[in-house]
Structures are given as structure tokens and as C-alpha cells.
A protein has these predicted regions:
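Flexible "stalk/tail and boundary" regions
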Residues: 1-12, 16-17, 25-81, 85-86, ...
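Short hydrophobic beta-strand that contains or immediately precedes a catalytic carboxylate
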Residues: 22
Length: 143
């Protein structure tokens, strides 16, 4: 997968069965199944298989004493979903409940993963996050 595979954002709705259409541009990269888990900032992280494996490997490489909580957070809330013939995935009720995602969502490309946000929360995040804050953060990590 190219690093720029998951970019942009798209508004969608989750149907009454918890299904979400993946945007066509992103669907071509994920294959027939996706891994999802509770993300940071109350979103859902969605990975294709290779991306999920890399994510798990990076978590497991952390010192054990510091990684236990992160491993439980991500693996304990993880789920696997097939991508159906219409390009839909099913988001488990448990993940929707814990992230506050109900109907209207924004699907966000985050380079190596897709993030699924409640649209109101995504809009709020964008309003609160300005370029100077991002610039300061990047300076702190030596970028």
C-alpha cells in the first residue's frame, strides 16, 4: 500500500444494521476484510490486514510494563469485518457505543489507516485544532 492511500475525508451514514459503505478510493486498498478497534479521540481505527499486523507488531515491541494498557485498549476492543460485495463493513455495536458513533460519520484517511468519526466530533476536532498547534507539536518531536 502506498503511504498516501488513505487520505481525505468523506461523509457517510451507518445503517440500522451497523453497516458502513467504505469510500471507493479507500476500498481498493483494504481487500476483503478489515480490522477495526477503538481509536484515540473516540474514533474507530480501521486497518487492512497488512496494516493491522504492522500496528500490532509496533505495539508488541513496546516495553511490556508500558504496553499492557495499550495492548488491552486496542486488542480488547478489536473486531474483524468482511467487506461485502457492495463495499460495506459492519461495525459492531460495542465499538459504536464506546465511541459514541450512531449514524452520521466522517471517514478520515490517516495515511496508514482509516479513522471513522462521529461527524459532529470530527467537525469539533477540526475547529479546535489550528495549524499553529500542529506546528508546535511537530517541533516538539523534531519534525
Amino acid at each position: 500500500m502506498a503511504l498516501n492511500a488513505f487520505i481525505g475525508n468523506y461523509q457517510h451514514s451507518i445503517d440500522t444494521k451497523g453497516r458502513l459503505f467504505l469510500p471507493a478510493k479507500q476500498r481498493s486498498y483494504v481487500g476483503e476484510k478489515v480490522y477495526m478497534t477503538r481509536g484515540l479521540d473516540d474514533c474507530i481505527f480501521l486497518f487492512y490486514e497488512e496494516g493491522w499486523n504492522a500496528f500490532v507488531e509496533s505495539l508488541m515491541s513496546l516495553p511490556t510494563s508500558k504496553s499492557r494498557t495499550a495492548l488491552r485498549f486496542f486488542s480488547g476492543n478489536a473486531a474483524l469485518s468482511d467487506v461485502d460485495g457492495q463495499g460495506r463493513i459492519t461495525i459492531p455495536q460495542s465499538l459504536r457505543k464506546i465511541t459514541g458513533i450512531e449514524k452520521d460519520v466522517t471517514v478520515v484517511g490517516a495515511l496508514n489507516r482509516i479513522e471513522i468519526w462521529d461527524t459532529e466530533r470530527w467537525d469539533s476536532f477540526n475547529l479546535q485544532t489550528d495549524s499553529s498547534a500542529v506546528s508546535e507539536l511537530l517541533e516538539e518531536v523534531g519534525f
